[in-house]
C-alpha cells in the first residue's frame, strides 16, 4: 500500500475523544522522569549518554525531575474533565455520586494497602521508637488524606513519601463535580477564577513565609495546573470536531515538538536553583509555565501526525501509563529499601558516595525493573480486580 496515501488517510481522520492515546505517552514521560529523579537521589549516577563520541547530559532533566509532578496533576485534570467535555457532543454524563464511587474504587484500596504495608514495616523496624503521639498522628492523617497539613506527617512520615500526591488528588476529587459543572457552564470565568486563585495563593505564600515547604504544594497553589488540564480536555474535544488534514497534523506536530523543547528549557532553568528554598520557590514560579506547556503538549500531540502520535503511544508507554499509580507509589520506597539492604553488591560501604559506576548502573536498573514489576503485579493483581469487584457489588446492590 502506498505509504503517502496511508499518511493522508490517517491525517484526515478525526482524533478519538474517548481515549486520548498520546496522553499515555505524556503520563509515562512525566512519571519516569519523576522516578528517575528519586532513584538518582539514592544512586548519584550522573545521567549522561555518549553517542558517536559526543556526550549528552541529562543532568538538568533529572536534577529537576520533581517538577514533572505538575504534569501528572495536569493530566488528572485533563482525564477527569474529558467525559464532561464530551457532553457537548451528546454523550451522557455521570452523577457526582457515580464519580466519587469510581474514584474511590480505583484509588482508596491501593492507598490503604500501601499504608498497611508501610505501617507494618515501620512497626517491625521500630521507626517510631517511643513516639506514640507521632505514630497516631502519622497514621490518622494518612487515613484521612490530611498528612499535608502538618510538617512532620508530610516530610517525616514513615508511611511513604509519595502518598502526598494522592492526598492532593483526593482533595481535588472532592471539589471536582462542582468545578466541572461551573467550568461547563462558565468556562472562561471558572478558568480565570481557578488560575487567579492559584496565582494569588502562590504570591501570598512567597511573601508571607520564610520557609514555604508546608505550603507550596497545597491545593490552592495547584488550581491553575488543574484548570489548564480541564481546559486542554475541552479544547481537544472541540478541536477533534473540526476538519482534519495534513496541514493540521503538521502544525500540531510542530507545536508538540516546540512544547517538549520548551519543557526542557524550563527544566534546565529549575535545575539551576542553588538551595532547597530556591528549588521550592522556583517550582512555584514555574508552575504556570509547566501547566501551559503541558496543556499545549496534550492537545497538540493528540492532533499531531502519525509518527508523533505513535512515538507517544506505543506498547511501552501504554504499559507504563497503565501501571503508573502503583509505580509512582512504590518506586521511591523500593529504591530506599534496595539501598539499605545492600541488595546490589559493591566493594564500597557507600558505593553511591564513592562513585562506583558499575554499582550505580546496576542499582538504577534494578530500581526501575523491580518497581515496574511490582507495579504491574499490584495493578493487575490487586488494583483493577478490587475496583471491578467494588463497582460490580455496587451495581448489584443498586439492582436489588
What does each of the following model-derived ranges do?
Residues 18-21, 57-69, 154-168, 207-228, ...:
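Interfacial loop-to-helix transition and helix-capping segments at the boundaries
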Amino acid at each position: 500500500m502506498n505509504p503517502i496515501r496511508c499518511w493522508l488517510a490517517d491525517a484526515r481522520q478525526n482524533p478519538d475523544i474517548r481515549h486520548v492515546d498520546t496522553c499515555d505517552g505524556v503520563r509515562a514521560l512525566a512519571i519516569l522522569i519523576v522516578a528517575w529523579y528519586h532513584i538518582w537521589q539514592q544512586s548519584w549516577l550522573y545521567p549522561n549518554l555518549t553517542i558517536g563520541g559526543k556526550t549528552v547530559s541529562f543532568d538538568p532533566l533529572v536534577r529537576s525531575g520533581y517538577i514533572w509532578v505538575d504534569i501528572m496533576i495536569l493530566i488528572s485534570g485533563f482525564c477527569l474533565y474529558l467525559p464532561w467535555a464530551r457532553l457537548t457532543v451528546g454523550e451522557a454524563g455521570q452523577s457526582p455520586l457515580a464519580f466519587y464511587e469510581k474514584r474511590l474504587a480505583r484509588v482508596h484500596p491501593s492507598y490503604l494497602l500501601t499504608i498497611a504495608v508501610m505501617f507494618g514495616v515501620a512497626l517491625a523496624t521500630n521507626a517510631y521508637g517511643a513516639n506514640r503521639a507521632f505514630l497516631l498522628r502519622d497514621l490518622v492523617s494518612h487515613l484521612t488524606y490530611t498528612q499535608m497539613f502538618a510538617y512532620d506527617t508530610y516530610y517525616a512520615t514513615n508511611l511513604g513519601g509519595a502518598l502526598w500526591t494522592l492526598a492532593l488528588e483526593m482533595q481535588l476529587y472532592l471539589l471536582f463535580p462542582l468545578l466541572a459543572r461551573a467550568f461547563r457552564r462558565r468556562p472562561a470565568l471558572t478558568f480565570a477564577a481557578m488560575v487567579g486563585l492559584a496565582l494569588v495563593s502562590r504570591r501570598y505564600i512567597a511573601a508571607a513565609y520564610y520557609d514555604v515547604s508546608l505550603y507550596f504544594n497545597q491545593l490552592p497553589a495547584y488550581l491553575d495546573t488543574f484548570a489548564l488540564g480541564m481546559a486542554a480536555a475541552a479544547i481537544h474535544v472541540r478541536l477533534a470536531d473540526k476538519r482534519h488534514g495534513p496541514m493540521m497534523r503538521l502544525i500540531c506536530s510542530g507545536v508538540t515538538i516546540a512544547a517538549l523543547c520548551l519543557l526542557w528549557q524550563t527544566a534546565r532553568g529549575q535545575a539551576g536553583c542553588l538551595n532547597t528554598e530556591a528549588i521550592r520557590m522556583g517550582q512555584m514560579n514555574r508552575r504556570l509555565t509547566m501547566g501551559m506547556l503541558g496543556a499545549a503538549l496534550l492537545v497538540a500531540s493528540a492532533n499531531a501526525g502519525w509518527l508523533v502520535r505513535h512515538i507517544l503511544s506505543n506498547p511501552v508507554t501504554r504499559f507504563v501509563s497503565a501501571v503508573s499509580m502503583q509505580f509512582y507509589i512504590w518506586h521511591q520506597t523500593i529504591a530506599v529499601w534496595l539501598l539499605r539492604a545492600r541488595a546490589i553488591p559493591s566493594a564500597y560501604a557507600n558505593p553511591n558516595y564513592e562513585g562506583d559506576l558499575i554499582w550505580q548502573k546496576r542499582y538504577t536498573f534494578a530500581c526501575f525493573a523491580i518497581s515496574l514489576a511490582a507495579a504491574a503485579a499490584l495493578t493487575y493483581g490487586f488494583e483493577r480486580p478490587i475496583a471491578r469487584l467494588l463497582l460490580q457489588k455496587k451495581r448489584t446492590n443498586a439492582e436489588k
